[in-house]
Amino acid sequence: MATLSQEATLVHQALVARGLETPLRSPVREMDDDARKQLIAGHMTEIMQLLNLDLEDDSLAETPQRIAKMYVNEVFSGLDYANFPKITVIENKMKVDEMVTVRDITLTSTCEHHFVIIDGQATVAYIPKDKVIGLSKINRIVQFFSSRPQVQERLTQQILVALQTLLGTSNVAVSIDAVHYCVKARGIRDATSATTTTSLGGLFKSSQNTRQEFLRSVRHR
């Protein structure tokens, strides 16, 4: 098993303490990625055969292996904290005390109820205290938690808590606007609706002016 970074461990512990960690079996089953892919491919073969698909066809023959590789290496890679991004946090020597906002962060996740796509954008803001973070690291944290089976409400809060933990401040805000393909492509088949979730901490929750400044940046993206 890969050794986790200190940052990954701290974030995981913070989410567990708040009841916000993604539901995982306990104890975690130890298995290397190749073995995991092999088992997933075997189960996908059975599913496709039950759907009466011909896996002898050259278009379908490698699909179980492709899906297994995609699940482990890409769309669900955020289930493994060994993949948590390397975080660069530096001392706030400039004494920045105004809002830092990153808008239009693209994200693609997977609805944990139907295993179909959630496609959206995030806006993340924080007010620095003793530390500032490399801006691209915010995008990577969003991508990490998006790379799991998710519900949007939990995803929003996970990003918030991760940044609060890494930055040592409660002054963090996250908003996500997303289209859920479990609504768009099945069931009611509503192709135009979107879902917005917001999680606010510190001054973003207690100060009306700070909250409104953040929400204006969300509306104007």
UniProtKB/Swiss-Prot annotation:
EC primary class: hydrolase
The keyword Metal-binding is annotated on this UniProt entry: yes
Enzyme Commission designation: 3.5.4.16
Keyword vocabulary terms for this entry: GTP-binding, Hydrolase, Metal-binding, Nucleotide-binding, One-carbon metabolism, Zinc
Gene3D superfamilies per the UniProt record, alphabetical: 1.10.286.10, 3.30.1130.10
Any single GO BP term: one-carbon metabolic process
Annotated binding of Zn(2+), by residue: 111, 114, 182
Keyword Nucleotide-binding: yes
GO cellular component term of the entry, any: cytoplasm
Reaction(s) catalysed by this chain's protein: GTP + H2O = 7,8-dihydroneopterin 3'-triphosphate + formate + H(+)
Protein family: Belongs to the GTP cyclohydrolase I family.
HAMAP family associated with the record: FolE
Quaternary structure note: Homomer.
Name of the protein this chain belongs to: GTP cyclohydrolase 1
Organism: Erwinia tasmaniensis (strain DSM 17950 / CFBP 7177 / CIP 109463 / NCPPB 4357 / Et1/99)
Gene name tied to this protein: folE
